């Protein structure tokens, strides 16, 4: 693999599939991805455009805080992660299950 492919797969970790993300796909043409913690909007946009061969309109990125958990009176927390909402230009679509 060349370095550009490694960078793309380093930025995009996995698609997030949930009821909310499915609804966003149908209504607004928005796809949700889990991305690396140091990825920027520009990195995410370039990775999606190169990997799926589509045109990206808007990228919104946010940090998701890990949940607090306890097990046998010991406190702990799950690690946080970074989420990206990617809106495609009208007429474009991604088959997330097939490509990733």
Swiss-Prot record:
Stretches assigned to coiled coil: none
Naming one, the record's GO cellular component terms include:
ribosome
InterPro entries, alphabetized: Nucleotide-bd_a/b_plait_sf, Ribosomal_uL23-like, Ribosomal_uL23/eL15/eS24_sf
GO terms classed as biological process = translation
Keywords, A to Z, come to: Ribonucleoprotein, Ribosomal protein, RNA-binding, rRNA-binding
* Any one GO molecular-function label of the UniProt entry: rRNA binding
**UniProt-listed PANTHER family:** 60S RIBOSOMAL PROTEIN L23A
Subunit info here reads: Part of the 50S ribosomal subunit. Contacts protein L29, and trigger factor when it is bound to the ribosome.
For this protein, the record's NCBIfam families field holds: PRK05738.1-3, PRK05738.2-4
Sequence similarity: Belongs to the universal ribosomal protein uL23 family.
Q: What does this protein do?
A: One of the early assembly proteins it binds 23S rRNA. One of the proteins that surrounds the polypeptide exit tunnel on the outside of the ribosome. Forms the main docking site for trigger factor binding to the ribosome.
Name under which the protein is recorded: Large ribosomal subunit protein uL23
**Designated gene of the protein:** rplW
